[in-house]
Amino acid sequence: MENKEVCLVCQDFSSGYHYGIPSCNGCKTFFRRTVMKKQKFVCQFDQNCPVDKSIRCACRFCRFEKCLKVGMDKTSLQASRDPIGYTKRNKKTLRHPMNELSGDESNSCTPDRQLSPLRSFENSLNFLAVRERSANELRMSSYLPKRSLKQALCSKPLINDPIFMSKHATVSPRHTFEKLRFITQDDYHYWHERDWFVLTEYAKTFKVFKNMPYHDKTELVCHAAIVIPVLNQVYNSPDYGLDTVVFPDGTYYDRTHEPTRPAGLNRKKYQVLDLVLKPFREMEINFNEFAAFKAITFLNPDADISLESKHAINEERVLITKQLYAYMVQKDGLEKAIYRFGRLILMGTSMSKMACESKEAVWIADFFENIGFTSFAKELIFGDH
């Protein structure tokens, strides 16, 4: 494919020359908005995140750096011209370059209709990745409202509100660090509250969740209150080895015994390291795989919900599971995909057991007043009753 047909930032189809290089509408808009709003981003990893059409939204720092690296010119940007909008694409029948989602699609020019199954799971996983990126932006912000579980679940989804996200979803100065420090009880409280808030907002982005009765919404979110925060904390942790989970503010925990914490919560910490962190690192789970696995974990029909909601959730869950498997086969080849997919899905069983044991530990800790939960946390852990 000639360069003029490909966005130099993400390798998607180019819609024309923008700011000096061929680029797609998405990267053009992202570059313009970043420059015009003078936005500053922070990479959560080593400033070397992949940027292609399957994962271009995952790290805005690395995406903007790539825009500059491939030649996008800030000086050619004029506020009164080149409005953000849709430019009709040149729909030629073209080969796609090898990339993370589409892989080696074809050895020759292939009509769009023949690529529709691949396009289908590409689009679905892209949507999950965008949702996950937005959820993490909210997690990294300083926004944390005080509200009841009912208020949280009945309000509009903030992640789907672009005006809110542009105003509030910026990285809090608190969520950066220069050196690590061992986590305290207050730090645990802080990050659990943040992750539970983001969980309620994440849940509301699912159409199947929106259509459920309130009782079922509550039960599903409460069922996910242990495992989803664990997934967030582990996947977004910078790599300091297989025995350390690091939070965005530089606080961390490892295998060090914490005598002031209940024994059950110490045990949960070791389970997180062994059952989640270690497999994630060994399998080298990428962003798309994580976004899909998190959705599969959240949409759990084993929650105490109505039969109708169980069917609806299971249908959505099976669809995402099939798309994840197809993606992994496309990316890894059949043999490796079967191993990685099987190992990833089996993690769900171990995590469910961990969640049950953790809730028992929390019940005991609350009974003996070992932990001071907020009313919102109590509703989420013990149910909205």
Swiss-Prot record:
GO terms for cellular component: chromatin; nucleus. InterPro entries: HNF4-like_DBD (IPR049636), NHR-like_dom_sf (IPR035500), Nucl_hrmn_rcpt_lig-bd (IPR000536), Nuclear_hormone_rcpt_NR2 (IPR050274), Znf_hrmn_rcpt (IPR001628), Znf_NHR/GATA (IPR013088). Residues 4-79 bind DNA. The keyword Transcription regulation applies. Residues 145-384 form the NR LBD domain. It is found in: Nucleus. A zinc finger (NR C4-type) spans 7-27, 43-62. Disulfide bonds: none annotated. GO terms for molecular function: nuclear receptor activity; RNA polymerase II cis-regulatory region sequence-specific DNA binding; zinc ion binding. Residues 373-384 are annotated as: AF-2. Keywords: Activator, DNA-binding, Metal-binding, Nucleus, Receptor, Transcription, Transcription regulation, Zinc, Zinc-finger. One of its GO terms (biological process) is regulation of transcription by RNA polymerase II. SUPFAM superfamilies: Glucocorticoid receptor-like (DNA-binding domain) (SSF57716), Nuclear receptor ligand-binding domain (SSF48508). Belongs to the nuclear hormone receptor family. Probable transcription factor that acts in a feed-forward loop with nhr-10 to activate genes, including itself, involved in the vitamin B12-independent breakdown of the short-chain fatty acid propionate. This pathway is triggered in response to a diet low in vitamin B12, when canonical vitamin B12-dependent propionate breakdown cannot function; the resulting accumulation of propionate is probably sensed by nhr-68 and/or nhr-10. This is Nuclear hormone receptor family member nhr-68.
